[in-house]
Amino acid sequence: AFIGDSRTDGFMIYSGIGNGKNLTSNGLSIFKLKEKKALTIDGKKYTLLEALALEQYGKVYLSLGVNELGYNNDKGFYEKYRDAIQTIRQLQPNAVIYIQGLIPLNEGVIAQTGGSRYLTNEHLRVYNDLMRKAAQEEGVVFLDLYSEFADGNDELPAEASKDGVHLRGAWCRQWL
């Protein structure tokens, strides 16, 4: 199962992964994970975690953090991530839990397309460090996607995204 925001949704659509439950919501943040009723299943609204509880999975991937960059609440982000990991563990006791680190941004493309100024790799790296720390403390796997996607300028290559945030289809396949 994959829990995340629009970046994870794009991955699920364009990567060709083929299987895996898509539990995503555009604009979702770790701060709203337990509150936002984002999925409709058989006519009933669920939070992503409520939907996760409907089935058992061998692996659960969590990737949230870009939408939170403008919150200026690093401590709250870290605490909510730990809480999310603990909740997922309760809901999926037999699953291996993976925290997917945030893929870098391309700040030049973000500026050209009128994106938000709070979207910076500097703050994104802080969030990755907090996610890594939460994963280590909770005994789950942290996947360093930043290093996999960063170019020689330590950012997402311009050709990888038309808005500097969301990956193009071919780059989603690289995520696999």
How would you label these PLM feature ranges?
Residues A1-K80:
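Conserved SGNH/GDSL esterase-like catalytic core that processes O-acyl groups on lipids
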Residues E35-A38, N67-G76, I88, S116-N121, ...:
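Second-shell loop/turn segments in exported
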Residues L52, I88-Q90:
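N-terminal cationic-hydrophobic initiation segments that often serve targeting/anchoring roles
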Residues S63, Q100-G101:
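Alpha/beta-hydrolase-fold catalytic nucleophile elbow
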Residues V66-E68, I103-N106:
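Active-site-proximal loop/turn and secondary-structure-junction residues that shape catalytic pockets
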Residues Y81-I85, N128:
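Generic structural signal for well-ordered alpha-helices
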Residues Q92-V96:
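A short helix->loop->beta-strand "cap" motif at the edges of active sites that frequently abuts
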Residues L105-L176:
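Catalytic His-Asp segment of secreted/periplasmic serine-dependent ester chemistry enzymes
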